[in-house]
Amino acid sequence: MPAPRAREQPRVPGERQPLLPRGARGPRRWRRAAGAAVLLVEMLERAAFFGVTANLVLYLNSTNFNWTGEQATRAALVFLGASYLLAPVGGWLADVYLGRYRAVALSLLLYLAASGLLPATAFPDGRSSFCGEMPASPLGPACPSAGCPRSSPSPYCAPVLYAGLLLLGLAASSVRSNLTSFGADQVMDLGRDATRRFFNWFYWSINLGAVLSLLVVAFIQQNISFLLGYSIPVGCVGLAFFIFLFATPVFITKPPMGSQVSSMLKLALQNCCPQLWQRHSARDRQCARVLADERSPQPGASPQEDIANFQVLVKILPVMVTLVPYWMVYFQMQSTYVLQGLHLHIPNIFPANPANISVALRAQGSSYTIPEAWLLLANVVVVLILVPLKDRLIDPLLLRCKLLPSALQKMALGMFFGFTSVIVAGVLEMERLHYIHHNETVSQQIGEVLYNAAPLSIWWQIPQYLLIGISEIFASIPGLEFAYSEAPRSMQGAIMGIFFCLSGVGSLLGSSLVALLSLPGGWLHCPKDFGNINNCRMDLYFFLLAGIQAVTALLFVWIAGRYERASQGPASHSRFSRDRG
């Protein structure tokens, strides 16, 4: 009985309620309709996102742009990083100026415009309009000796593509940071169980969109046309925008409530640099003591609440920061794992020739090659199967036996599976290079590019994709749970934004590591092997990632242990006194 009363609190000034029929069942039915609309929008947006990322390395590495494998991998990691790193920007704009509804709508519009760049550059006239003419020869003169230094060719159309990918990353990150909370607002009145189920289905929608995109869009991009393949994500975003606008009458929309970013920065400055803070605030000692914002008297957090929220942030941040190396590992499946797969033997679908030689069959037009991006389905299918199984069967059983691990313990287990994934990838790369160095190769044409691949089947990559999928269940989902549940209500949006931002930091650090190792003398420096990785040492790169993950996993276990002991101590009563909604 008390819970329903708590949810009937006065509405926020400026909050718009949907035009719902009055009645016992009407509101519940329309709340579910609003939640379903959000799930459909998220599914279409994720289908578009994976449609962009699945073959981005292949697209940039193709004859359309002639980027090297290292350059294409770096661009993919930058885009993935931006799509997470910029999440606080969208959340801040929604909190301060736009509100979540308008932030999502405007983000989808930007998404639609930015995603149009990829199909626009997928045909010659469009490329020449945006990028100019490609240089006659992207390769320099041959090296007289194997050890002579030579830099990789400057990537064609890089400024335009990077600008478009960064705008696309900003749009995707803004949708990610606002649509999740906006959807939860729609079902919050139905109770806490409805909110929990919404998040389960929300994660399902993400992966369902990924499945549809990888099955259809990735196949079209690799075997038919990049123009058609990249036009489908544009259509998905357009349909998502239409559905979002069409469902407006059933949405609950809330006005912007302000941001606590300035308060947190002031508190950080006071704690880290007290002398500097005292000089800065000497004109107002009382302001320096209570850290009050220069706000007019309006609803918002009090100075005491700001201090309490800052203390929570200081406790949570070390836990989330130690997840960054996990994200470095996680994003390999959409960058270096793809590049590795392009240099393994990719079988044909419905081959007409028993010899199954890819180049000959492609020349005859008698079959299609299996899209390398389909291996991402191993990750997605694991999530689609194990999430409901874990939610409905495994977790309740462990709970009855009092063996259910905490979110932090699950995250540590997820790091272990991520570690094993890159170890498996490194071992496979060692075996692949063994065949390459003994001149045991097969030539295969993928899209318009000819690759010298090892005779190892691409199916050998399935274990590393399965392991990264299992790690996602134990690290990513509990990470979201931890960030949402440990934050006070007034900072849930900010802390979720920080969580996604740190995910992007992991991707960008992975990109920086690739760039560093691509310098002359680095493991990934192989300019004489244009477009390929056969003279690189990507196996050592994978083992380096595994070592970084192992060290930080041990650090995470220590930090998480301290956090849980502090939560169970005398101060734990304050944890439960915070308003988590």
Swiss-Prot record:
GO CC terms, sorted: endosome membrane; intracellular membrane-bounded organelle; lysosomal membrane
pH profile: Optimum pH is 5.5.
Region (Disordered): 1-26
Biased composition (Basic and acidic residues): 1-14
Glycosylation sites noted in the Swiss-Prot or TrEMBL record: N61, N66, N178, N223, N356, N439
One protein family per Pfam: PTR2
Chief place where the protein resides: membrane
Transmembrane segments: 38-58, 76-96, 103-123, 155-175, 200-220, 232-252, 310-330, 369-389, 411-431, 458-478, 497-517, 540-560
Keywords: Endosome, Glycoprotein, Immunity, Innate immunity, Lysosome, Membrane, Peptide transport, Protein transport, Symport, Transmembrane, Transmembrane helix, Transport
BP GO annotations: dipeptide import across plasma membrane; innate immune response; monoatomic ion transport; peptidoglycan transport; positive regulation of nucleotide-binding oligomerization domain containing 2 signaling pathway; protein transport
Record carries keyword Transmembrane: yes
GO MF annotations, alphabetized: dipeptide transmembrane transporter activity; peptide:proton symporter activity; peptidoglycan transmembrane transporter activity
Reaction equations catalysed: glycylglycylglycine(out) + n H(+)(out) = glycylglycylglycine(in) + n H(+)(in); carnosine(out) + n H(+)(out) = carnosine(in) + n H(+)(in); L-histidine(out) + n H(+)(out) = L-histidine(in) + n H(+)(in); N-acetyl-D-muramoyl-L-alanyl-D-isoglutamine(out) + n H(+)(out) = N-acetyl-D-muramoyl-L-alanyl-D-isoglutamine(in) + n H(+)(in)
Subcellular location: Lysosome membrane; Endosome membrane
Membrane-related topology note: Multi-pass membrane protein
Its job: Proton-coupled amino-acid transporter that transports free histidine and certain di- and tripeptides, and is involved in innate immune response. Also able to transport carnosine. Involved in the detection of microbial pathogens by toll-like receptors (TLRs) and NOD-like receptors (NLRs), probably by mediating transport of bacterial peptidoglycans across the endolysosomal membrane: catalyzes the transport of certain bacterial peptidoglycans, such as muramyl dipeptide (MDP), the NOD2 ligand.
Family: Belongs to the major facilitator superfamily. Proton-dependent oligopeptide transporter (POT/PTR) (TC 2.A.17) family.
The protein's name: Solute carrier family 15 member 3
Species of the source: Homo sapiens (Human)
Gene name as annotated: SLC15A3
